[in-house]
Amino acid sequence: MNFGANLLTNYNEELTEKFYRLFPSIPLMLATLAALVISIFFLTYFFYKPIRKNIKKRKQYIQDNIDAANKLKQQSLENLEESNKKLNEAREQASEIINSSKRDAELIVINYKMSAQKKSEEILKKAQLEIKRKEEEFLRTSREEIIDAATIIAKKILIKEIDSNYEKKIIDDISFDSEK
């Protein structure tokens, strides 16, 4: 039984040793824990924070670029809208100018027509007045010539028989008849 007890003792010792190996010693555990804490602190302080800071900066840079792009896009849309508005206003003004010019041209044509018509009417009136004046002058001169001719004829016929008062009466009668 010695052999069995030895084997059992050996087995127990091996098991105990394996058990101790399974759980490290407290100083080794504390040293490992301290190394882990120092490593975590070192990694956090020298790598994680700078990387996080750079990522945050990059994220902010990207966001700023996106915001700037959106702002530029908005400004571009506003400028486009303003340009379209100005273009429409310019088209309206051009249309108004063209319409105004057409109206002015039509008014000028109408004024020239009216002026020409007035001038032609004035010329016609002057011509009619001139014709009337010439007719009156012709009638007056004709009467005078007829009266002169009648007087000469009457004098020749009645030279001896009619006195000058009677002659005037005849001339006045002839003048009076010719005026009618």
Swiss-Prot record:
Return any one Pfam family short name: ATP-synt_B
Primary location class: membrane
Bilayer topology reads: Single-pass membrane protein
**Gene3D superfamilies, per the entry:** F1F0 ATP synthase subunit B, membrane domain
UniProt keywords (A-Z) are: ATP synthesis, Cell membrane, CF(0), Hydrogen ion transport, Ion transport, Membrane, Transmembrane, Transmembrane helix, Transport
Q: Where are the transmembrane segments?
A: 26-46
Family assignment from sequence similarity: Belongs to the ATPase B chain family.
- Compartments (UniProt record): Cell membrane
By what name is this protein known?
ATP synthase subunit b
> SUPFAM superfamilies recorded for this chain?
F1F0 ATP synthase subunit B, membrane domain (SSF81573)
Q: What does this protein do?
A: F(1)F(0) ATP synthase produces ATP from ADP in the presence of a proton or sodium gradient. F-type ATPases consist of two structural domains, F(1) containing the extramembraneous catalytic core and F(0) containing the membrane proton channel, linked together by a central stalk and a peripheral stalk. During catalysis, ATP synthesis in the catalytic domain of F(1) is coupled via a rotary mechanism of the central stalk subunits to proton translocation.
GO MF annotations, alphabetized: proton-transporting ATP synthase activity, rotational mechanism; proton-transporting ATPase activity, rotational mechanism
Q: Please indicate if the UniProt record lists Membrane as a keyword.
A: yes
Q: How does it assemble?
A: F-type ATPases have 2 components, F(1) - the catalytic core - and F(0) - the membrane proton channel. F(1) has five subunits: alpha(3), beta(3), gamma(1), delta(1), epsilon(1). F(0) has three main subunits: a(1), b(2) and c(10-14). The alpha and beta chains form an alternating ring which encloses part of the gamma chain. F(1) is attached to F(0) by a central stalk formed by the gamma and epsilon chains, while a peripheral stalk is formed by the delta and b chains.
**Cellular component GO terms, alphabetical:** plasma membrane; proton-transporting ATP synthase complex
